[in-house]
From Swiss-Prot:
Coiled coil: none annotated. TRNA binds at Y15, Y64, N66, N112. The keyword Kinase does not apply. Belongs to the PTH family. It comes from the Bacteria. This is Peptidyl-tRNA hydrolase.
Amino acid sequence: MKYLIIGLGNIGHEYELTRHNIGFQVLDQLAAEHQVKFQIDRLALITSFSYKGRSLYLIKPTTYMNLSGKAAQYWINKLKIPIENTLTIVDDLALPFGKLRLRPQGSSAGHNGLKSLEEYLKTQAYPRLRFGIGNDFTKGQQSNYVLSRFKDQELSLLESPINQACKIIKSFSTLGITRTMEQCNADVSIT
């Protein structure tokens, strides 16, 4: 069985370690755990590995956030992966820093990357793992906040939720979304 894991973010050195790029950071960690490297291909950086009989394809769109759906649609079609076998990793202002929430579907909640996915996939019914980045910004500064780098003290706290996100991705591919949601949304450690 094949799975497509889509990490949302922006390409370029200036966006590394920014809140908006947490999807890229999670995929970088997962690739490192499985000793695979990303290669540039059509509309994305891509890599893959096998896990418990499943093929996991990881993409980091090179289209920038606002056109992420274009890359997702291309790879879903090319690899012939059903939408329910995709998982999008996305930053979320509505969740506290480091909090993870797995959902089978939902609205974009104003997130441009998710809006793009909805536009290209023609549905809101695709699984997503929301990664809380907090909301410590003044009114009107949301854009600056999501494009800002994590503070040093936050960086030291990211390791645990990033590792947990990697476990959730693997659980999603082996146990399915319902059982994985029961575990991760209840804050039970995924083993």
